[in-house]
Structures are given as C-alpha cells and as structure tokens.
Amino acid sequence: MKNFLSIEVDRKRVFGLDLLRAVAIFCVVQGHGERLLFDTALDRFTDLPVPHGVDIFFIMSGFLIGKSFISYLESHNNRLGRQKILTFYARTALRILPNYLFILLVNYLLVHFQVIVGNTKAFPIWRFATFTQNLFTPFWDFYWESWSLPVQWWFYIFFPLFFVLLSRFAQPKKYIPWLCLFFVVFSITFRLSMADHVTNRFSYDVWMRKTVASRIENIYIGVLAAWLMHYFPKQWKRYGILCFILGIALFAATRIIPRNLGSFYHNAVYLTISALSVGLWVPLLTRWKSYKTAVGGFISRISILSYAMFLTNSLVILTMDTVCPQFMHHHGVLAYGVYWIVVLAVSYLLHILVEKPFVQLRERIK
C-alpha cells in the first residue's frame, strides 16, 4: 500500500524512537485484544512477556519534552520566557485535545445510545474534559483508555513552571535530577498511602496503575534520560548497548519477581522499576537515526498513528463485542485479525480527518 495511504514521514524523525512508539502501541492494542486468542491455536502467544505500552509512552513524553526545554534553557542563558511557555501550551493543546475530545464525544454518544456499556453519571463528562478524572482517585466504566492522558497533560502544564521557578536558583544541570527524584519519591509515597484501597487486582489497577499521582514519576524518568543525554553525551553514546542490556535484564526481572498483591514490591516500586527498564533502552535507540527499508517506513507510519490507535482500540473492541458477539466469541483468531484491521482503519481516519489538520496548524506556531 503506497506509503501507507500517504502518511508523510518527516526525515528529521529518529527511527529508533519511532520503533519504540510502534512497540508501545502494539503492546497496548495486543493487550486489549488478547482475550480473543484465549482457547485458540494462538493462545500461547498471549503469555509472551511484553512491556507495558503506556510505560514507553510516558518515558518518551518526558524524554522529548525534557530534551527540548533543556536545550532551550542552555541556549537562552537559563531563561524561560513567557512567549516560550505560551507557545508550548498552544502546541501541546493542538496535539492532544482534538483527538481526545473527539473520542470523548464518541464514547459519550455510544454509551448514551447503548451501543457500549458505560457510566456517565458516576464520573461526569466535565471531569474528562478537564483531565481531572483520576488525579488522586480512580475512575472506571467510561472512556477507559483516557486514563494516561491526564498524567501527560498535567506534566505538560507544570513542567515549564518548575523550570521558571527553579532556574532562578540554579542551573538545569543541578536541579533536574533532584526534581526527578522528588516525583519518584512522591509517587512511591502516594502508592504506599493508598495501599489500604488495594484489595484485589481491579483495585490495584485503578488506584495504583491508573492515577496521575501514582504514574507521574514515569514521565520524570524520561526527563532524567534527557538530562543524561544533554550533559553527558559521550557516556550516553559509549554505554548505549550496556544500558540496553541492563534494561532488558531489569525488564526480565520484573517478570520473574513475584508480584504478590499487597507486597511492598508490588505496591511501591514495581511501576518505578518497570518504567526505569524502558528508560534504559533509550540511549541505544536514539542512535538509530533512519531506516532504509519498506518495513522501516511502515514502522514510522504506525508510530505516527499511535496516538489515534491508543484512543480508539478499546472503543473498537467494545463496539465489536456489542455488534457481533457471536462472531467475537466463536471465531477468536479471525476476530482478532478483524479487530486489528478495524483499529488501523479507524485510527487512520481519525488521524487524517481530525488529528492531521490540527498538527498542521500546530506547525505554524513557532
């Protein structure tokens, strides 16, 4: 299919990071659709150890935004002006809000007309529109896939302000590690304080894994990676392979160490270690600048579609469950294939019709 239906790839993109995004969205879509493969010939593939896709997205957000702000401060005498902050906010809004609000509306309409099951009374729409649905307490039964967006949104809001405040007292090289450490300690402390709410896997998922206060640390691990890349470039390049190997080993350890419900490891540090393992992959992958094959081009285009895919995949499978339940139940492998095709098709339409026009507008804001 020619250039994946004309999705343009900017040659300035770093292919290694595109690959990481593609892996992330594969893990997310696979994770939500793997139940279709249970009790089929492909059942064994559901047990393959894969990273949490959201961990990767969090690390990527912190790394890219951190890299941008550190470079700006170093080239502007450690000063972050009002215009830079307002420009960043405008570009962020144009990147996140169109897809997010459009899919929020679609979710609401599908629930309202009983196409999918959901509860808009317990968690009103305004909380989702203001990214306050899971700041310190969880939500469920509506727009499930939105949970990670408030984590990123509030990072984007406050991160520049921290730079403005802290730059009055020190250079970024000195205060960024402490800022990152603060949020790691903050998230771990929050999870420990919420331990009484965790009585089963579901409560762990919504209280520990899907609240802003619990997951904000993951993005700051990405910021720390950006700090290391900027201030220690020789070591960043020299130890890339070693860091990648350590990251794989740490990831393997998170799959081997028992995560007993209620344990200190499970409640307090598992999410930190899991994100750190992903962060260790970044030094090597940033060295992979470009691709030379059609497969590489396809991977970069999947990376471009990843935001749309993230917001639509749960909606697709929930709608398919309602519209064709017998097909979903009795034809698992085929249904899984159809699920992927529909996710790609719907994501492409969302990207072309909603996301791309605003991204083009965003590029005019410098």
Language model region names:
Residues 1-16, 23-26, 30-51, 66-83, ...:
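Alpha-helical transmembrane segments in multi-pass integral membrane proteins
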Residues 11-17, 77-101, 117-120, 158, ...:
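Membrane-interfacial loop-to-helix junctions in multi-pass inner-membrane proteins
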Residues 15, 55, 84, 88, ...:
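Amphipathic alpha-helical recognition patches that constitute DNA-binding helices
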Residues 17-25, 61, 92-101, 150-164, ...:
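Conserved beta-strand->loop/alpha-helix structural units within folded catalytic cores of enzymes
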Residues 58, 89-90, 94, 98, ...:
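Internal alpha-helical transmembrane segments of multi-pass membrane proteins, especially GPCRs
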Residues 82-90, 96-151, 183-212, 273-282:
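Membrane-interface helix-loop-helix regions
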Residues 126-134, 157-158, 162, 315:
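Short hydrophobic/aromatic helix or loop-helix immediately within or flanking a transmembrane segment
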Residues 178-185, 243-249:
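Central hydrophobic cores of alpha-helical transmembrane segments
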